[in-house]
Amino acid sequence: MKLKISFLILVLFSVFFAIEGIIKWFPASVNGKGHSSCTNGLEMTEEDFCKMLCGIDGKLRESKCVDHWCYCSQILFP
């Protein structure tokens, strides 16, 4: 049983890291004006603000903050 659980965890982590390596990340920008920061004055967490920026056009994208800068993935489901 422990072997099955360990194998399942290994497979899940492998899939996660494979997907992370496949996704292309692009700097988030508002109206095409440079790279957007994750910091905000809206009392939102950096992750939530970045997620809002990446989905502002209604397209489904992943988002992440790296060193307080927001990055968006390519459109996942056009």
Curated annotation (Swiss-Prot):
Record's GO cellular component terms:
extracellular region
**Residue ranges of the propeptide:** 22-32
**Claim: Secreted is one of the keywords in the record:** yes
Q: How is it modified after translation?
A: Contains 3 disulfide bonds.
Sorted UniProt keywords: Disulfide bond, Ion channel impairing toxin, Potassium channel impairing toxin, Secreted, Signal, Toxin
Q: Has UniProt tagged this entry with the keyword Zinc-finger?
A: no
Q: Where in the cell is it found?
A: Secreted
Q: Found in which tissues?
A: Expressed by the venom gland.
Q: What molecular function does GO assign, one term?
A: potassium channel regulator activity
**Signal peptide positions (record):** 1-21
General function of this protein: Reversibly inhibits potassium channels.
Q: What is this protein called?
A: Toxin BmTxKS4
